Every structure is written in C-alpha cells, then in structure tokens.
Regions:
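The feature captures the beta-strand-to-loop junction immediately N-terminal to the Walker
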Residues: 47-49
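Conserved ABC ATPase signature
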Residues: 138-142, 146
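Conserved ABC transporter NBD signature motif
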Residues: 70-82
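Conserved ABC ATPase "signature" region
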Residues: 113-134, 186
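Short helical segment in ABC ATPase nucleotide-binding domains corresponding to the A-loop/adjacent helical element
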Residues: 102-110, 119, 227
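Helix-to-loop junction immediately C-terminal to a conserved catalytic motif
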Residues: 62
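A short, proline-enriched helix->beta-strand linker immediately N-terminal to the Walker B motif
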Residues: 157-161
C-alpha cells in the first residue's frame, strides 16, 4: 500500500536560468525572475510556446540543473540534486527492452536494494494500471499506451512527493491520449501528491490541471496563473471548459481564434 504522504510546498523564488551558446558568446535566457508556489494535492499544468522554459522548470525541480539566479526549494530546503522524492516521466517511455514489464517496474527498487514490501508494491502498480496479465511481456510486445503506463508506475513505485511529467502523452494517438489522461488523473487522485506537467495542448492543460501556469518566451516567464475551478471528471464541451480554454488562448495572444 502507498505510504502516507506529508504535505509538500514547492517554491521557486526569483528563479532565472541562462544557458551559454557553444558557437558564440551569446546566451539564452531560458527563465527570468520566475516565482511560484505549489502544494500537495495540486495538479499544475505548464503551457506555452516552445522555448518558453517549461521543461527547464521541470529540470530545475528534478534537480538535474541548478538555477543561475534565485532559489528552488521543497519545504524550505534548497534543491541541490536529484531525489527519489521527485520523480520525472518523459514523453517517450524509455523502458529497458531486455526486462519484462514486472522487472521494469521494480527496477528502481532493485537498484536501491529495497526488498521490504517489494512484491506487494509491484503488484499494486500492476493492478493500478490494469496490466497484471502482461507482467511477463517485454516492451516490444506492448502498445504505446501500455508502455507509457508502465513508465508512469515505474516512477510512481518510489512513492515520491512530487510527480514531474514532461509531455508524457505527446507521442500517443488522440484516443490513447485521452484514456491516459484519465489514468494519470486517477493515480494522482489516489496518491494526492503534487503533480507538475508540461504540455503543448491547451485542452489537456485545462482537462487535467487544478491550475494552469501560462508561459511566454524571450525570456521564459509566467504570465498567468489560472485556477481551474471545476470538478473531475471534466466535460470538454461545457461552456466553462471552453471559457478557460479561451482565457488561456487570450493570454497567449491567440484571442478570437476558435475551433
């Protein structure tokens, strides 16, 4: 069974990130003066054009890169590197092709030598994504949606406090993508951790997020923090859903464009 979670407070305080260009003396201002606070139980969607710093924020929170200026902290403690309490799921499943579904899911536990309750935790993850009868299959035998579910629970088995999702559904077809949106929301609702997701889809951001952070580029910055005050599951055709969608479009200077 999942362990009881402590409340988490993630803060970015006046964070800027600058990348030097190898081929010239110029620099890229990926983020400039970003300040935001997120807490347990929130599902925060990051949306904006390519190059606005969405994935940079995830990498900062994951501890893969440090800020150039400012501070990133969890419960007041500065992030100074990766932690099993902050799990990152990428767009592509990146499963180990030589391991079965079951072995892929248990991989991080095996590496850490975490034997206590291992079998129960793996069984819980398989049940959560409905793949019990595929436990002995290999990644090449799975559909795209099945592989992404395995990648998701391979991260979740560490029972982290913060779940980071970097366009986790971008490579899937539309039908599988919608099913996976519900899968992720169901898991998030059970675990009650903080989830932070990067997406290029405004509909996905509104459908899944309790908050949507809208970003612009040059330099990367947050220009709007929109609370989505709707119960789950959400109706994509409802007037309120369309209103939220149009508000985000307006923030991104696409007001007046309607599908």
């Amino acid at each position: 069974m999942p362990k009881e979670k402590n409340d988490v407070c993630l803060t970015l305080e006046n964070v800027s990130k600058v990348f030097a260009r190898v081929e010239s003396d110029e620099v890229t201002h990926a983020l400039q003066d970003v300040s935001v606070t997120m807490k347990s139980g929130e599902f925060v969607s990051l949306v904006g054009p390519s190059g606005c710093g969405k994935s940079t924020i995830l990498r900062l929170v994951a501890g893969l890169i440090p800020p150039t200026l400012g501070r990133a902290a969890v419960n007041g403690e500065e992030i100074d590197g990766p932690s099993p309490e902050r799990g990152l799921v990428f767009q592509n499943p990146t499963l180990f092709p030589w391991l079965t579904v079951e072995k892929n899911i248990s991989f991080s536990l095996d590496v850490r030598g975490a034997k206590a309750g291992k079998a129960e935790r793996v069984e819980c993850m398989l049940s959560m994504i409905g793949l019990e009868r595929f436990r002995n299959d290999y990644p090449a035998q799975l559909s795209g949606g099945m592989a992404q579910r395995v990648a998701l629970v391979r991260t979740l088995i560490n029972e982290q406090e913060i779940l980071l999702l970097d366009e986790p559904l971008g490579a899937l077809d539309e039908f599988t993508r919608m099913n996976m949106q519900d899968e992720i929301l169901n898991i998030w609702a059970q675990r009650k951790q903080l989830a932070l997701m990067v997406t290029h889809s405004i509909d996905e951001a509104v459908y899944m997020g309790t908050r949507v952070l809208v970003m612009e580029s040059n330099p990367g910055r947050i220009v709007a923090d929109i609370k989505i005050d709707e119960d789950f599951p959400r109706d994509r055709s409802s007037a309120s859903f369309v209103e939220y969608r149009n508000e985000i479009l307006n923030r991104l200077h696409f007001g007046g464009k309607k599908d």
